[in-house]
């Protein structure tokens, strides 16, 4: 095993920034072979704390690499808190054998990795899991049949149902999953610095492809034949089909024993699935906590890490089970989600008005959609877009293919907490049409900022 000086220095600096206990030193053994039941060998790195009394063992499994400095600092932070940490590359990624197929193999591969973990002389007898996005999905895969020695999990911004993520609106989430597939397809080329730069440039890279008709040849050239799942996803528009059932891990929500901390952001692409995870686990009586910040899928990482460490050391478990950030306000501690709230009903009126009274009959509001000038995606719960999250959407609201309905100036501040519902009577000339509804906050100067979609 060798010391990773850069990872340790980065972990120490991040530890200090987050106000966590002083980081211990650690050593790293890289590219350890881990056998799977079908003969494939997956590679893992082991971060070993230099202490006689380790805090425990953590397992992380994901497709995004092990060698990049951000990954090493992230894992090193936990090792610096005294944990043995195993970071494994899922099959077909970064030296692990087999083919990467999102959602497939993770249940069996996770179980086989735990079997290997039990055989290691340094294993502490119990382990926990942590990780975000796909590293949260692999945790849920392991929780389909929770190992007896898995004591707790911290699942951050993770789906349990890929079909729902890709097709839940009735149309394919093209920008999100073409972008994600592109990043996965080429992430291994050029080292970790180029990987970061490629990720930052993804929205710009995607733009000409998304504007090309027909899309198929342009998308195929972008992906370079490296993502066979992408075309299969396009061919499976029913999220409840057997295909998607085989890639999902919703069974974990019926089986896991907990305890679990779920972390998401109001503008995270998988926020709705995290809230569903919380509701289903709470309904079963599982010990589950929830943290919701003002984050997108790509932000809030350091705060989520701090929440994870506090959960693992027991202090977060002793606090209120639900912590949410009211955007523009304070963090609130709650006993449950959603909290008791007063329902408000607003009605669309002719003349672009939004009022609490029902409208009299009137002419319908209409707009014309031009496929040559599609309505852009601006802000919101996007996965890889550079324009995700809270954003000034004033120009979007002023487009001729967008209808707006606005309240009078509100006499007092209103906290919007809960799930909004929209009942809309509509018809279109073209049966192949999608409608998108957004709630935005209009400032006194007329500028509009999205709240939720």
Regions found by a protein language model. Give the residues of each.
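Accessory cap/linker subdomain of secreted extracellular hydrolases
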Residues: 80, 144-255
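Proline/glycine-enriched tight loop/beta-turn segments at coil->beta junctions
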Residues: 40-42, 49-58, 123, 255-257
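C-terminal, loop-rich substrate-recognition/catalytic regions characterized by aromatic stacking residues
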Residues: 2, 201-204, 210-213, 291-293, ...
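Short beta-strand/loop motif that positions the catalytic acidic residue
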Residues: 256, 262-264
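N-terminal cap/lid segment of alpha/beta-hydrolase-fold proteins
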Residues: 16-51, 406-412, 425
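Active-site-adjacent alpha-helix of alpha/beta-hydrolase-fold enzymes
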Residues: 272-287
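Alpha/beta-hydrolase fold nucleophile elbow
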Residues: 121-134
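Cap/lid segment of the alpha/beta-hydrolase catalytic domain
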Residues: 49-119, 166, 174, 431, ...
